[in-house]
A protein has these predicted regions:
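Conserved ABC transporter NBD signature motif
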Residues: 52-69
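Conserved ABC ATPase "signature" region
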Residues: 106-124
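Conserved ABC ATPase signature
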Residues: 128-132, 136
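H-loop/switch region of ABC-family ATPase nucleotide-binding domains
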Residues: 188-189
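H-loop (His-switch) and adjacent beta-strand-loop-beta switch element
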Residues: 200-214
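ABC ATPase nucleotide-binding domains
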Residues: 215-242
């Protein structure tokens, strides 16, 4: 289980997250949703230990080892003009296990190729990444995370800018992973899709306003507070809360 207790983050003297609490069991698929600036990316980065924070974050009761977490950052965060191919990008996700400047062993190559097969990119393993489309790049980043065979997978806006077939491919994959026991935490702006796809939702706006099964989050006032909107906002109608 992932447990986040009383997590607070300050960046540049500004409070970004305040006393966030979250629990995510193995095999659960949770959507992390909230408005722009709500702290979704910061929360994922805090779980990884990439930003200073107060409070506690544990996985299976132990301090988190970020080398064992699968993490898919937003696509623009990766240097796509770097002169490497698809397989090398996926292998870069294993750097924590390989160490710097060490050649990958056969089991590492096998893990990378298996991950590429999971995202239907095996036939492009030798292609330079600068030649990939946006959807292909996103699938490579997912494969990079999956090469670790993680039990905890963090996804930061994985569907941004993707066409519908790619979104469906990745959604099916994330559901399969959760059904196989992987804990999946995904930030997303697609609220309607998150409501339909994710077993659990966490509503975040600098603090957690609710974390519960998506079928139970029907309180209109709660969504209004999360997104700071009026009762007649079309967003609430789209979510079935007219």
């Amino acid at each position: 289980m992932l447990e986040v207790n009383q997590l607070s983050v300050q960046l540049g003297g500004r409070s970004v997250l305040q006393e966030v609490n979250l629990k995510l069991d193995q095999g659960q698929f949770m959507g992390l949703i909230g408005p722009n600036g709500a702290g979704k990316t910061t929360l994922l980065r805090a779980i990884l230990g990439l930003v200073p924070s107060t409070g506690t974050i544990t996985w299976q009761g132990q301090r988190i080892d970020r080398r064992a977490i699968g993490y898919v950052p937003q696509r623009h965060a990766f240097a796509w003009d770097f002169p490497i191919n698809v397989r090398q990008v996926v292998l870069s996700g294993l750097t924590g296990r390989l160490g710097w400047l060490r050649r990958p062993r056969p089991e590492h190559l096998e893990a990378a190729d298996c991950a590429l097969e999971q995202v239907s990119m095996s036939d492009l393993r030798s292609r330079p990444v600068e030649q990939l489309s946006g959807g292909q790049r996103q699938r490579v980043l997912v494969a990079r995370a999956l090469a670790l065979k993680p039990q905890l997978l963090l996804l930061d806006e994985p569907f941004t800018g993707l066409d519908m077939p790619t979104q469906e491919l990745l959604t099916d994959l994330f559901k399969e992973l959760s059904q196989a026991g992987v804990a999946v935490l995904m930030s997303t702006h697609d609220l309607v899709a998150a409501q339909a796809q994710c077993e659990y939702l966490c509503l975040l706006n600098r603090t957690d306003l609710a974390c519960a099964p998506s079928s139970q989050l029907k309180d209109k006032d709660l969504w209004m507070r999360t997104f700071q909107v009026r009762a007649d906002n079309p967003l609430l109608q789209a979510l079935g809360m007219s």
